[in-house]
Amino acid sequence: MLKWALIFLVVGLVLGALGFGGIGGAFVGLAKILFFIAIALFIVFALLALFAGKKISDSI
């Protein structure tokens, strides 16, 4: 899960640079939407990794 969280963080940062930096031109709106989706998925997967890892370590 943490792997996916880091992937979505990188995707979000790249899309943010393209969308908010104005490099994307016609794709600015799409890049901004995908940026927020990627950041939301990063948060979800980071929390899942945190809580799942804690439950696994507690059961050992």
Curated annotation (Swiss-Prot):
Membrane topology: Multi-pass membrane protein
UniProt keyword Transcription regulation, yes or no: no
Transmembrane segments: 4-24, 33-53
Keyword Transmembrane tagged: yes
GO cellular component: plasma membrane
Subcellular location: Cell membrane
Alphabetical keyword list: Cell membrane, Membrane, Transmembrane, Transmembrane helix
InterPro entries according to UniProt: DUF1328 (IPR009760)
UniProt-listed Pfam families: DUF1328
Family membership: Belongs to the UPF0391 family.
The name this protein goes by in its record: UPF0391 membrane protein Swit_2334
Lineage: Bacteria, Pseudomonadati, Pseudomonadota, Alphaproteobacteria, Sphingomonadales
